[in-house]
Amino acid sequence: MANALAGNRIMCITWIAPDEYAATKLRDTVDDSIEFVRNSTPQEGPMRMIHSFFSEGPEYEMSESWIEGKHPPKTGRVILNLYEIYATEEGLDLAWVEAAEWFPTLAEMLEEFKIEMTVANQLSITHNLWD
């Protein structure tokens, strides 16, 4: 059903690691947090997490190659994304509070390995095609 997720809240964290070694360190940190998130996040009710996924791939140079069906050259950096969808704003707020204990470790790792981080938080889903 189209737009079944409309109105739900999403958070997206994008990390850009300068190389594969730094990306591996970030992957290890994410792997360490998965069980914590699984056990601390509501799976039912208005505060529930609807979906979460982690994706990654190489960073590519900006180029028109994509519209020609070709891949442009890779930069050597690695892009990693974490997406979490929650039923409500309050559910996403709770997720941040619950994750606070991980922030010092994450901040230290980002600084040590020179990993860039961008957060888009409390975005409201406006359209989705399929569930």
Model-flagged regions — what are they?
Residues 1-98, 111-131:
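Short S/T/G/P-rich N-terminal loop/turn motif that feeds into the first structured element of a domain
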